[in-house]
From Swiss-Prot:
Residues 1-20 form the signal peptide. This is Anionic peptide NDBP7. Keywords: Secreted, Signal. The keyword DNA damage does not apply.
Amino acid sequence: MISRFCLLFLLVFVVSKIQAAEDFNEENEVDDLDDLDFLDDLDLDLSPEELEYLENWVKEFED
């Protein structure tokens, strides 16, 4: 009886950890998409070409 309870507890614990890890990864993917949003807040006079260059540079760096 106690061993069944321990196995059930362990199973629930592992499943909850896996779910938390998946949620964390999804949040990080969303954050990665917004990495260059701070450039808009800096009020820099970047041309669209310069902004595109920076975005491409970040994409190449991530690969």
